[in-house]
Amino acid sequence: DVERSRGLGDVYKRQLYNWTDSPWKGQGYLDYIMQNFYTNEPDGIIGNEDCGQMSAWYVMSALGFYQVSPGIPVYTLGRPMVNKASMHVKGGIFEILVKNNSAANKYIKEVKLNGKILDTLFISHTDIIKGGKLEFIMTDQPVK
């Protein structure tokens, strides 16, 4: 129940759908949480901010990836909120591009890493720090 996602450390659970046969469900929930529970109002962050944990979750999720288990260098991919972002990393620049991004297009149709279509919704920490390009193609229909 998304409405119960008002507690500290609970919002990340939507990324766990990537380990099921229904990752599109998590993408829909992520969109709902980021659109409704994070605003620029005084009470715009759900639950307890806990020294930045909730903000960090939002920033990473809005970029389209999140490390569910600290210490394990794997990131799960989800519904990005940005159209474009870049990060300076050890290997140069890691660029995130999101095509067809809109309020209606909240589902991932395809993801490419450095031009290669991914067959999974996971990337490694090494993929990020080497630099390169992560490209999301979004759609308004769940990809089942």
Regions found by a protein language model. Give the residues of each.
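Single conserved hydrophobic/aromatic residue that forms the stacking wall/gate
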Residues: D1-Y12
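Non-catalytic C-terminal accessory modules of carbohydrate-active enzymes
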Residues: D10-K144
